[in-house]
Amino acid sequence: MAVTRISILILLLLFLVACRHERQTEQQPNDKQLREYLEAANQLLIDGERQEIKDMVERHGWNMVESPTGLWFQIYEKGAGRKVNRGDIAIIHYSISLATGDKIYASNPNEPKQFQVGRGGVETGLEEGILMMRIGDKARFILPSHLAHGVPGDGVRIPTRATIIYNVELVDLL
C-alpha cells in the first residue's frame, strides 16, 4: 500500500512539473519575438547615443555632417593631395578622445600609424572617414560605439559602448 501511495504521489508530482513546464514554454518568446525585442532595445540605445553626439556637436559649435551609418565627420583643413582609395596604405597622425574630452590615445609624432584601407584592423568608423579624405586633410570623426569598439570597448582605455572622437591628419598614401 505504501508503494502505491508513493507511486501515486510521484506520478502526481511529475504531472504537476510537466504542466508547469508547458506553461513556462508558452510564456517564453519565440526567436522572432526575441529578435524584435533585442532590435528595439538596441535601436533605443543607438538613438540615445545619437542624441548625445548631436548635443556635443552643437555644444562645441562643430560644423559636422552625419553619414548614413552614423559617423559624424568634419574636414576642417583641406589638403591638396590625392583622394584615398580602398587598398591604399594610409599614413596618419591621430589622437583619440572620449566624449568626456579625455584624451586616451595618440600617434607618436615620429611614427605615424599605417594601415591598409579596406582590410580591417582599425575601427569601422575610421575606415569610413579616411575614405572621405585627401592627402594633407585634417579631419574630426565622431564614432558612435557601433562604429568604434562596440559593447566590450577595447579592454584597456575605451569603456563599454563608448563614443570616441578621432582627430586625424592624412600624412600620405602608399
Predicted feature locations:
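Cross-family detector of peptidyl-prolyl cis-trans isomerase
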Residues: C19-L174
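Sec-dependent bacterial lipoprotein signal peptides
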Residues: M1-C19
